[in-house]
Structures are given as C-alpha cells and as structure tokens.
Amino acid sequence: MTTKIYILNGPNLNRLGKREPQIYGHETLEMLKNRCLEKASSLGLEIDFRQTNFEGVLIESVHEATDLGVGGIIINPAGLTFTSVALMDALKMFEGPKVELHISNVHQREPVYHDSLVSAPVTAVMAGFGTDGYLLALEWIKGRAR
C-alpha cells in the first residue's frame, strides 16, 4: 500500500512564476506539482497536491487529511501563516508528521513575515530552499509518515 501525503498550498501560490520572481523564482505551480509527483513516485509515495486562495478550503483539506488518516502533510500556508488561528487549530488535530514550508526565508524578509502561527503545531519548518524545499520535505516525511 502506498502512503499518501497531502501537499497543501495557500493564497497566491497559484501565481508562482509571475508574482515576485526575484523572491519565489520563475517556476509555475504546475511545474512544481509535476516535480513533486515525480519525486513522490521515486520515493514510493502518493501525493494529493492542492492550492487554494481561501482559508476555509485549506482548513477543510487539513480536516480531510485528518479524517482519512493520510501519512503526512506538507503545507505552505503562504499569507495565512501569520494570521490564521483556525488553520493552526486544524493542524493540531492531525496526528501525523506535518511540515510547514516556505519558498523564501521568511526570517530574512519584512517583520510581518517573522511570526508564524502555524509553526507551533507542526513537526518541522522549512524555509529558504526555494521550490526545492518541497522535494526535501517529501524526502524528510517519507521516513516519518504513518
């Protein structure tokens, strides 16, 4: 049986490749998804790769992962990282490994990006690896997935 990992992407990540490429690079979300699918396959994992601009939809995806007992969650909450108590609470309910991921090093950016509400309930935090962080997170989570 293949372990399923949810990769959840928050607001504005559908604009990868267009939005601030000097920070986020030129790779589109579709290109990133394809790289993640390829990496997951090589690791013997199955992924469900999602993006939404809506807080409630992201929270419902975490609830779904919890209810289905998926192997792990990799989440880039984007701007919701710093504002969403509800997302933080949803992540507390998921008992498997959880990685908070950011493409840029949020700690080198403006102060508004320094205080994550999502970091407390997750297992690990990755930031500053560019989109390669997603591939590294898949490698890390493989050995810890339930």
Q: Predicted regions span which residues?
A:
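Mobile beta-alpha loop/short-helix "lid" or hinge segments that flank ligand
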Residues: Y6-N12, I103-L117
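Glycine- and acidic-residue-enriched helix-capping/strand-helix junction motifs
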Residues: L16-E30
